[in-house]
């Protein structure tokens, strides 16, 4: 890694999986939805090369050509497998309320959208020049529910309330209550509204209809669970 001249930007280029169709396009659509929900992510785009799309995203640990000190959740505390424990880390690092609300939004989005690969290396913290820690923008936000034996199943790496699947709206609300997150109901409802736009966004990205159907069905099932008054 080298220093860049003024005006240049550090990027990460994620090449499409040669064995799975539309990996870049799906990640881009999930990026669009996550940012529409209010989740912080670095600017990203699809980069076409020789007829294939690849996912290009700015690095969150580089600003104005300088490297920011960052550490994954795993490197800071190791073997964290509950969202409740990430909130504990946030309190220990004294991050502002905004970051904790951002973390709650990520948890809700991940559980509804099927981002099951939410392990402790997919959460990071940045120490800024003032010496204060902040949670990093989200990254690696994409559908990972198993549908062709290459991705994880529907169980999350990071559990909520000792459950690694979505059981009820109360499961999410309890996570909010125990961590003093305000307006949890409206946050959940806003994320649901955005995720209901998946099919149109996926068609705009020219994703194959059978794959759209698979992801859409998962999202609909999760929304049904959240809206079931008996759960």
Protein language model annotation of sequence segments:
Residues 1-120, 124-231:
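Anionic ligand-binding catalytic core segments
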């Amino acid at each position: 890694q080298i220093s860049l001249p003024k005006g240049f930007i550090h990027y990460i280029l994620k090449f499409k999986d040669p064995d799975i169709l539309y990996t870049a396009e799906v990640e881009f659509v999930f990026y669009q939805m996550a940012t529409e929900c209010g989740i912080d992510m670095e600017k990203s785009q699809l980069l076409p090369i020789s007829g294939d799309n690849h996912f290009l995203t700015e690095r969150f640990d580089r600003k104005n050509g300088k490297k920011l000190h960052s550490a994954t959740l795993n490197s800071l505390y190791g073997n964290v497998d509950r969202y409740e424990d990430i909130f504990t880390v946030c309190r220990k690092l004294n991050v502002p309320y905004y970051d904790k609300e951002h973390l709650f939004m990520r948890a809700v989005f991940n559980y509804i959208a099927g981002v099951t690969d939410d392990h402790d290396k997919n959460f990071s913290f940045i120490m800024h020049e003032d010496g204060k820690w902040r949670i990093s923008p989200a990254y690696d936000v994409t559908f990972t529910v198993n549908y062709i034996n290459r991705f994880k199943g529907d169980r999350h790496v990071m559990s909520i309330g000792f459950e690694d699947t979505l059981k009820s709206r109360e499961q999410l609300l309890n996570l909010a209550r125990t961590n003093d997150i305000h307006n949890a109901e409206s946050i959940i409802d806003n994320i649901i509204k955005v995720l209901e736009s998946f099919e149109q966004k996926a068609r705009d990205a020219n994703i194959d209809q059978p794959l759209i159907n698979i992801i859409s069905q998962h999202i609909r099932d999760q929304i049904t669970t959240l809206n079931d008054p008996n759960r």
